[in-house]
Amino acid sequence: MSTLEIIILALLQGLTEFLPISSSAHLILPSQVLGWQDQGLAFDVAVHVGTLLAVMMYFRKELGVMAVAWLGTVGVGPEKGRGGFDAKLSWWILLATIPAGLFGLLGKDFIEEHLRSALVIAMTTLLFGFLLGFADIKAGKRTEHKPMEKLGLKGAMLIGLAQAVALIPGTSRSGITMTIGLMLGLSRDNAARFSFLLSIPAIAMAGSYLTLKLILSTESVDWFAMGLGSLLAFVSAYACIHYFLILLEKLGMMPFVIYRLILGVGLLWFIL
């Protein structure tokens, strides 16, 4: 890859991982539409590491509290036996990650062979864009929103199942999990925060899988591309999370819905 391609793809990964517009679609499309070469396993690992570090850094305080509370539920640390909402939230996040892990393990070959196409991306971009818009309109009309404490394990698992569907390119992991969060009555801010916390084990699993594939492969490693890609993905992802949460209550999801509809229609026009 050229340095320009590294910069563009790393920034795309960082910006689109947490916006409801599908990071996988934006990484697949350059190779299919522009004819760029596949970025390779090593680069995939690098940008996953960058985005994972960004979301963990941004939510470091919440993660610290949740980790201590979770350890207390298994009889370890100062919160031993206390429980509380942070402990529940930790368990919800862990359990809600299982569907995506199972779906990814069982369906990865089918997805790679049959669903990584511009047509699939166009259709999922449009379909789940409409659903996001519907959920956002409903959320905007509500006078009261369900606090995250009232989400419950059932609600968390529904969001987790949605995250599994997001393995289909073009769906958007953050987009569909926020959509279900909004449909379940969460505010835009809480739907986004739960989605971002849920992304941590999901990105970690994906990164670990790619790392294992890289170790077992004979692919050469471009350390410059990995380092630059990881750094740019980290910076862009951190900035994206920060400003997205600031602007979300003011702008809602509609700017992203409009973008998805334009992208989906544009892709259909390009390929048909």
Curated annotation (Swiss-Prot):
**GO BP annotations, alphabetical order:** cell wall organization; peptidoglycan biosynthetic process; regulation of cell shape; response to antibiotic
Q: Which organism is it from?
A: Colwellia psychrerythraea (strain 34H / ATCC BAA-681)
Q: Per the similarity annotation, which family is this?
A: Belongs to the UppP family.
* GO MF term list: undecaprenyl-diphosphatase activity
Q: Which domain of life is it from?
A: Bacteria
| Cellular localisation | Cell inner membrane
The encoding gene? uppP
Q: What else is known?
A: Bacitracin is thought to be involved in the inhibition of peptidoglycan synthesis by sequestering undecaprenyl diphosphate, thereby reducing the pool of lipid carrier available.
Entries under InterPro entries matching the protein: UppP
Name the UniProt record assigns to this protein: Undecaprenyl-diphosphatase
Please describe what this protein does.
Catalyzes the dephosphorylation of undecaprenyl diphosphate (UPP). Confers resistance to bacitracin.
According to its record, how does it sit in the membrane? Multi-pass membrane protein
Please state the Enzyme Commission number of this protein.
3.6.1.27
Q: Which reaction does it catalyse?
A: di-trans,octa-cis-undecaprenyl diphosphate + H2O = di-trans,octa-cis-undecaprenyl phosphate + phosphate + H(+)
Q: Name one GO cellular component term.
A: plasma membrane
Catalytic class of the enzyme? hydrolase
Task: List the keywords (alphabetical).
Answer: Antibiotic resistance, Cell inner membrane, Cell membrane, Cell shape, Cell wall biogenesis/degradation, Hydrolase, Membrane, Peptidoglycan synthesis, Transmembrane, Transmembrane helix
* Cited NCBIfam families: PRK00281.2-4, undec_PP_bacA
UniProt key word Hydrolase: yes
Q: Does the keyword Transcription apply?
A: no
Q: Which residues cross the membrane?
A: 1-21, 39-59, 91-111, 117-137, 151-171, 196-216, 228-248, 251-271
Q: Which Pfam families match?
A: BacA
